[in-house]
Curated annotation (Swiss-Prot):
Pathway entry: Carbohydrate metabolism; D-xylose degradation
E.C. no: 1.1.1.307
Name of the molecule in the record: NAD(P)H-dependent D-xylose reductase XYR1
Description of what induces expression: Overexpressed during growth on both D-xylose or L-arabinose compared to D-glucose. Significantly expressed during late stages of infection of barley leaves.
Binding site for NAD(+): 168-169, 217-226, 273-283
InterPro entries given in the database record: AKR (IPR020471), AKR2D (IPR044487), Aldo/ket_reductase_CS (IPR018170), NADP_OxRdtase_dom (IPR023210), NADP_OxRdtase_dom_sf (IPR036812)
Record bears the keyword NADP: yes
Gene coding for it: XYR1
GO molecular function, one term: D-xylose reductase (NADPH) activity
UniProt catalytic activity: xylitol + NAD(+) = D-xylose + NADH + H(+); xylitol + NADP(+) = D-xylose + NADPH + H(+)
Active-site residues, record numbering mapped to chain: 50
Top EC class for this record: oxidoreductase
Length: 324
């Protein structure tokens, strides 16, 4: 079974169901990527900050060497970290990331967060994380503007280092500003999206502007409990939420499939992950069946406006209220 594709605004076809690589441990990452390719996944969503791009590339190489897939059949996504936003830093770090993956180009490259931090040389610490110092106490902003960074991103397309470019964790006002000066429009926006954080107006804004939305953390608090976030622990896990469980029974699916289909049926791409082959295959079936419109609305009504993936939820800071 192949994932259906979504047409990006540059004509590129992007698989609607991909495989996320956040928190995939280095020790198993190569095998996880290889097994995901065997299970049918073709889009892999990585990032500098995940710290596992070398191992991701090893899994891809193994699959290609064994004839399971060709490079051109894969859709590999990566992201620009905050410490590389200065215009002259963008291309060098992309080339490093490509070398880590062992590939010549990305299919899609995103600005990870709309936050510019002071440069940390990869030879000093990589991935650099949010803090300038090794002790993890000092946040140092860079003076790079989003426009400066985006101009450098556009040059990646010109140089053939990425086929498409986009953004992640941006809000509508930043997107509207970008569209005033962008020579190459962002092809996608990647956002935290689950029934506890629907962001429907942002999704509608992207649809109007021809920007495809990719949902991450589709299972909500399940991805964040290990960080001891009180609000993640206080909420009913979405995989156990009575509304979701009831709909899973109604459609003969598991709760994870219901959560993913809620997104894909509304026109979003998804990037779930699992190290278990059974769950890999289950998550891949987030398309090919439909729920009634009333059930889609019932899931959306669970919205609480609760966001998990913001810096202040990971460490104490008064400087990084990105979504304020």
């Amino acid at each position: 079974m192949a994932s259906p594709t979504m047409k990006l605004n540059n004509g590129l076809d992007m698989p609607q169901v991909g495989f996320g690589l956040w928190k995939v441990e280095n020790s198993v990452c190569a095998d996880v990527v290889y097994n995901a390719i065997k299970a049918g996944y073709r889009l892999f969503d990585g990032a500098c900050d995940y710290g596992n791009e070398v191992e991701c590339g090893q899994g891809v190489k193994r699959a290609i060497d064994e004839g399971l897939v060709k490079r051109e059949e894969l859709f590999i996504v990566s992201k620009l970290w905050n410490t590389f936003h200065d215009g002259e830093r963008v291309e060098p770090i992309v080339k490093k990331q490509l070398a880590d993956w062992g590939i010549e180009y990305f299919d899609l490259y995103l600005i990870h967060f709309p936050v510019a931090l002071e440069y940390v040389d990869p030879s000093v610490r990589y991935p650099p994380g949010w803090h300038y110092d090794d002790a993890g106490t000092e946040i140092r902003p860079s003076k790079a503007s989003i426009q400066e960074t985006w101009t450098a991103m556009e040059k990646l397309v010109d140089a053939g280092l990425s086929k498409a470019i986009g953004v992640s964790n941006f809000q509508a006002q930043l997107l509207y500003d970008m569209l005033r000066y962008a020579r190459i429009r962002p092809a996608t926006l990647q956002i935290e999206h689950h029934p506890y954080l629907v962001q429907q107006r942002l999704i509608e804004a992207c649809k109007t502007e021809g920007i495809v939305v990719t949902a991450y953390s589709s299972f909500g608090p399940a991805s964040f409990k290990e960080f001891n976030m009180e609000h993640a622990e206080a909420l009913t896990p979405l995989l156990e939420e009575p509304t979701i469980v009831k709909l899973a029974e109604k459609y003969g699916k598991d709760p994870g499939q219901v959560l993913l289909r809620w997104a894909t049926q509304r026109g979003l791409a998804v990037i779930p992950k699992s190290s278990r082959e059974k769950t890999m295959k289950s998550n891949f079936e987030a398309v090919g069946w439909d729920m009634e419109d009333s059930d889609i609305k019932t899931i959306s009504a669970l919205d609480k406006g609760i966001r998990f993936n913001q810096p202040a939820n990971y460490f104490s800071t008064d400087k990084l209220w990105i979504f304020g």
